[in-house]
Curated annotation (Swiss-Prot):
Coiled coil: none annotated. One of its GO terms (cellular component) is membrane. It comes from the Bacteria. The keyword Membrane does not apply. This is Uncharacterized protein aq_1480.
Amino acid sequence: MSLLTRRLKPYYEELLEPLVNFFGKYNVSPNLITLFGLFLVGLGSFFLYLENLILAFLLLLLGALADSIDGALARRLNLKTEFGAFLDSTVDRFSDALPFTALGVHYASYGDETGVLLSFLALISSFGVSYTRARAESLGVYGLGGVFERTERWIVLLGSILLGLLKLGLFIITLGSLITVFQRVYETKKALEVKR
């Protein structure tokens, strides 16, 4: 967990508490919230492709909120399961990919090679962040952090959409993600050497 995530998490969870209470009151399935969040991100990505930045921002923000609520709701209802965790992680990868893919296709339709390159660099590097953690954990190395994790990626993505600075946002996401990948590779190497 990054420093920013650690500091913001308590305040963020407090803000989400009324929503968690509402869904908990009606016993809404956390997995349903997970899938609905993916639907919202998909819809938001479609509007991002259409360059309707206001609708894209609102839908992607709601999708990100749904992704935050599902875990808290599962804990509240005591419905935490291995499948739920697996589904959440799987859906997260699709949610990460959809906005970058939408931007890549959008830029390609205008023949904007720089935009296409930045979109797919952001996609690949963000997947690298997720993969290094998953692979390290399969080797028994846990607790990997980094300066630019999923929370930071989404903050930059949403901020760049709101400000209309999409290419700058993609560049920051790519750079931050690559730094985090190298951090995790280095930390994993050190941890595995200690285990020998």
